[in-house]
Every structure is written in structure tokens, then in C-alpha cells.
């Protein structure tokens, strides 16, 4: 009988320790999930994409004169897969989030080249959509506001196409980009989609875009 009691006590202790460990793991996962919010490179719930989230992403870059936080909400009914980012100037230490399901939003950032260099942050990012087409987003934060302004653009290209210099030139010069003027703008993207976006006019800028079904 005493042996059975001892075995019972040992088993109870093991179960309690396992439950405690599982609870700790769950709590840590929850903390990781909370930390992932407002971190460049993360994928968050689309409904939680706000200016405040992007300002947090922007602030994390530190004291940099030219920088941008980008948030793109996927309400397209499709899954997006990252292709690449092309930087005309500037850089990012963050890798594009690989997979962005419907109902989620990606967070990304960019900054001017390091050091005392007179550059802004200008680039294009591309995502392959599950319908076989490509979502492309342009962002342009110049160094010299005496000559240039903030600009952004969004377009769906037929087929899969990586971001490059040619895509940048098309989106910046030829395809009616929007000025970063602290206002919302809308565009029919074709292929049953539409886009709505906002960019401010600051050298420390945010770009928020929502891609939805038309």
C-alpha cells in the first residue's frame, strides 16, 4: 500500500510539473506574439494595422533623418508570397515577411544608407499572389525636399515579376503615383482588386495600404 501511495505521489508531481511547464510555454508564446506586433518583418492581423502600429515600427529605427514604416493589409482573398525588394537608394535590415495570408498585414521598414550620406530611402517591393499575378508597392522618401516630395504607388502586374529598376521607373514616372500629402487615395488595381493608401509628407514617413476585393 505504501508503495502505491509513493507511486501516486510521484505521478502527481510529474503531472503538475508538466502542466506548469506547458503553461509557461503558452505564456511565453503569448509574449512572443505580443512582441511580434509592431515589429518590422512581422505579420499581424489586418484589422490591427493602424497609424500607431506604424509609428512604433518607425520609432524602432532610431534617430535617422530619412526612414519609412510600411504596412500592407491583405484583404484580397488570396495568399501572398514575398519575392523581393529593390532599393533605388537606402536599405533595410529586415527581410520581407515570407507569407501573408488573407486577413493579415505585413510590416516592413526602410532607411537611408548609413553614415553622413545625402540619400533618401526609395524602393519597390513585390509579392507573388496566389492567382498568379504580382502586387508591387513603391515608396519614395527623398533626401532633398527642395527638389523632391514623398511619393508612393501600388499596382498589380500580370504574371510573376520581381522588383527591379524598370519596375521602379514605371511606378515612379509613368503610372500616376500618389504624392505623400497626409491624405488617403484610392485606386482600381484591376483583377477584381482595389487599393486604398496613406502616406505622410515627413522625412520620417509611414505608408499604410489596404488591398481589398473590388
Curated annotation (Swiss-Prot):
Q: Where is this region: Trp-rich region, which is important for the binding to lipid membrane?
A: 140-155
- The feature of type site (Interacts with the lipid membrane) is located at 179
The residues of the propeptide are: 20-35
Q: At the top level of its lineage, which domain of life is listed?
A: Eukaryota
* Pfam assignment, any one: Anemone_cytotox
- Which stretches of sequence are listed as region Plays an important role in the hemolytic activity? 38-47
A single GO molecular function term of this UniProt record? toxin activity
Which keywords does UniProt give here? Cleavage on pair of basic residues, Cytolysis, Ion transport, Membrane, Nematocyst, Secreted, Signal, Target cell membrane, Target membrane, Toxin, Transmembrane, Transport
InterPro entries per record: Actinoporin_PFT, Anemon_actinoporin-like, Cytolysin/lectin
Task: From the UniProt annotation, give the residues forming the signal peptide.
Answer: 1-19
Q: What does this protein do?
A: Pore-forming protein that forms cations-selective hydrophilic pores of around 1 nm and causes cytolysis. Pore formation is a multi-step process that involves specific recognition of membrane sphingomyelin (but neither cholesterol nor phosphatidylcholine) using aromatic rich region and adjacent phosphocholine (POC) binding site, firm binding to the membrane (mainly driven by hydrophobic interactions) accompanied by the transfer of the N-terminal region to the lipid-water interface and finally pore formation after oligomerization of monomers.
A Gene Ontology biological process term:
pore complex assembly
Q: Which SUPFAM superfamilies match?
A: Cytolysin/lectin (SSF63724)
User: Which stretches does the entry tag as region N-terminal region?
Assistant: 46-65
Domain notes for this protein: Composed of a long N-terminal alpha-helix and a core region rich in beta-sheet structures. Before the pore formation, the alpha-helix binds the lipid membrane, partitions into the lipid-water interface and stabilizes the monomeric molecule on the membrane. Finally, it traverses the bilayer, thus forming the transmembrane pore.
Report the family membership. Answer: Belongs to the actinoporin family. Sea anemone subfamily.
Query: What name does UniProt use for this protein?
Result: DELTA-actitoxin-Aeq1b
Q: Which organism is it from?
A: Actinia equina
Motif, Cell attachment site, crucial for protein stability: chain positions: 179-181
Amino acid at each position: 500500500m505504501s508503495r502505491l501511495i509513493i507511486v501516486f505521489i510521484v505521478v502527481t508531481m510529474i503531472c503538475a510539473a508538466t502542466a506548469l511547464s506547458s503553461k509557461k510555454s503558452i505564456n511565453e508564446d503569448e509574449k512572443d506574439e505580443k512582441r511580434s506586433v509592431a515589429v518590422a518583418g512581422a505579420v499581424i492581423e489586418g484589422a490591427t494595422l493602424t497609424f500607431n502600429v506604424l509609428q512604433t515600427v518607425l520609432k524602432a529605427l532610431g534617430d535617422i533623418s530619412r526612414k519609412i514604416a510600411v504596412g500592407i493589409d491583405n484583404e484580397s482573398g488570396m495568399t501572398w508570397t514575398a519575392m523581393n525588394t529593390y532599393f533605388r537608394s537606402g536599405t533595410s535590415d529586415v527581410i520581407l515577411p515570407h507569407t501573408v495570408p488573407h486577413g493579415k498585414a505585413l510590416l516592413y521598414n526602410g532607411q537611408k544608407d548609413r553614415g553622413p550620406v545625402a540619400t533618401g530611402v526609395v524602393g519597390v517591393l513585390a509579392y507573388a499572389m496566389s492567382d498568379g499575378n504580382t502586387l508591387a508597392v513603391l515608396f519614395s522618401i527623398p533626401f532633398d525636399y527642395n527638389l523632391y516630395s514623398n511619393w508612393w504607388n501600388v499596382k498589380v502586374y500580370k504574371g510573376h515579376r520581381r522588383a527591379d529598376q524598370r519596375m521602379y521607373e514605371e511606378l515612379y514616372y509613368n503610372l500616376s503615383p500618389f504624392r505623400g500629402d497626409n491624405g488617403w487615395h484610392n485606386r482600381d488595381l484591376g483583377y477584381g482588386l482595389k487599393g486604398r493608401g496613406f502616406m505622410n509628407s515627413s522625412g520620417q514617413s509611414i505608408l499604410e495600404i489596404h488591398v481589398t476585393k473590388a
